[in-house]
Regions:
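Single conserved hydrophobic/aromatic residue that forms the stacking wall/gate
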Residues: 1-9, 13
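Internal transmembrane alpha-helices of multipass membrane proteins
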Residues: 7, 18-67, 121
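Hydrophobic alpha-helical transmembrane segments of multi-pass membrane proteins
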Residues: 19-29, 76-80, 158-166, 248, ...
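Divalent metal-coordination and catalytic microenvironments
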Residues: 43, 53, 78, 105, ...
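Interfacial and helix-entry/exit segments of alpha-helical transmembrane bundles
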Residues: 49-54, 59, 96-132, 155-163, ...
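Interfacial segments of multi-pass membrane proteins
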Residues: 59-63, 139-157
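Predominantly late transmembrane helices and immediately cytosolic-facing juxtamembrane segments
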Residues: 82, 86, 157-228, 305-309, ...
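Aromatic-capped, Gly/Pro-kinked transmembrane alpha-helices
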Residues: 233, 237, 248, 259-304, ...
Length: 425
């Protein structure tokens, strides 16, 4: 991202709309489809990690829309609330005795109040709640995409809006399963059986329909977790104090930084945008202050999509867990696709790594063994050996053999001095 922004001058000078469209489309695909992967994760750290990939997609979208300062702005705000969420996930893992599976949690709010409230603030910032830092940066990206007219901008606009719903859904899916609902820790869990879990989802309101992967890496050893009767605990102050400190900018930094970073002179002389790409000019024209933007945000599609994502997550995992079980049953193929990360790992293993191994094997067989060892190394030795055998015939000790060699040498010299000048003319 940083290198792309550093190269924005070349993109502007040469007016590479094709390159910008490519960046816009790649970013929007990343923002949406990495968010889908976050929905099915059960490892608390993986949910936050795929969220990070999705948000990097939003930043890339901003680059494609020539809103470079917005990309940096979202990078900055995202650094605070994502660091908060990662540290909160670590706090939960500590409190759960290194269990990272959100299906084994639930009801942690009363045991870990500081982690609970800071996680809520970080999640609200992530989904773009008005007045929170993520709102100002993410909404600016969405508006910049709406203002651009590059090829692929229609798809990008759809993807970033759909991504708002997806982000809210997986963020609060994790939040509700970890901090609310029935306490599921300190019990024996059988997450390895798909059908057993699908049945359990009908009876247990806290369980998740996606917890049925025999090969899912839950991120913890089978001996980790709370023993029966053991309760979670809040993390020590060396963890909770940074949580509180990170929560403050996660809420406030966007409010105070949007004016200088996007509409002030913060990037003067550093970022130059081609006049034909007017996304930033349109953002500046419609900006009337951070408070006005937050109030206006309550009536925009991103806010209602985020709210819909939160409500949907609450309904599916707190009120009626039969809904996720139904989706798993009827859309098992889709779940398998997401579970296997769109088979990109398999693609990389077969085509990228396999192709590299095939190329390396070919170079080893043809280049190294045949050309280098066979022709140059061993071949040169064989030529010297053959030449030695030929020369050895004339080194017999008989004078007529030496005389014959001298005659051949003289004929060679005469041929050189007589024939070569003819060709030289």
């Amino acid at each position: 991202l940083h290198l792309s922004i550093r190269r924005q001058r070349q993109m502007c000078i040469r007016d590479r709309d094709t390159a910008l469209s490519f960046i816009l489309i790649i970013g929007s695909i990343t923002a949406l489809f990495m968010g889908f992967l976050g929905i099915i994760q059960n490892d608390i750290k993986r949910v936050v990690a795929y969220s990070t990939l999705s948000q990097l997609g939003y930043m890339t979208v901003a680059l494609g829309a020539s809103a470079y300062s917005v990309a940096v702005f979202h990078l900055m705000t995202h650094a605070f609330f994502k660091a908060l969420l990662f540290l909160a996930a670590g706090s939960v893992i500590i409190g759960m005795h290194h269990d990272q599976d959100i299906r084994n949690m639930g009801g942690l709010r009363k045991y870990m109040p500081i982690t609970w409230i800071t996680s809520l603030l970080g999640s609200l910032a992530l989904i773009g709640t008005p007045l929170f830092s993520g709102f100002y940066s993410k909404d600016s990206i969405i508006e910049a995409v709406h203002a651009t007219h590059l090829f692929g901008s229609g798809f990008a606009n759809f993807a970033v809006l759909a991504g708002v719903f997806v982000t809210a859904f997986y963020s609060f899916r994790m939040y509700f399963l970890v901090f609310h609902g029935e306490e599921r820790f300190g019990k024996e869990h059988a997450h390895h059986d798909d059908h057993a879990h699908a049945k359990a989802a009908h009876a247990d309101h806290g369980h998740d329909d996606h917890a049925h992967d025999a090969h899912d890496d839950h991120g913890h050893d089978e001996h980790h977790g709370l023993a029966p009767g053991q309760k979670p605990h809040e993390s020590p102050w060396v963890v909770t104090l940074p949580l509180v400190l990170l929560a403050i900018p996660s809420v406030l930094i966007g409010f105070f930084a949007i004016q200088p970073m996007l509409h002030g002179d913060f990037f003067n002389g550093v970022i130059t945008v081609n006049e034909s790409h007017g996304a930033m000019a349109e953002l500046k024209e419609h900006f009337h202050g951070a408070v006005a933007m937050a109030i206006h945000g309550l009536s925009t599609a991103p806010f209602w999509l985020a709210l819909a994502g939160v409500v949907t997550a609450y309904y599916c995992y707190m009120i009626n867990p039969r809904v996720p079980a139904w989706f798993y049953k009827h859309f098992h193929a889709l779940h398998t696709l997401l579970e296997n990360k769109y088979y990109m790992d398999k693609f990389n293993e077969v085509f990228i790594a396999g192709g590299a191994r095939l190329l390396g094997g070919g170079l080893s067989k043809v280049g190294d063994k045949t050309l280098i060892d066979g022709l140059i190394v061993n071949g040169s030795a064989k030529v010297v050996a053959w030449f030695s055998r030929v020369i050895r015939v004339f080194q017999s000790g008989y004078i007529y053999h030496y005389a014959f060699v001298m005659i051949l040498g003289m004929l060679g010299l005469l041929s050189y001095f007589v024939i070569f000048p003819l060709f030289a003319k």
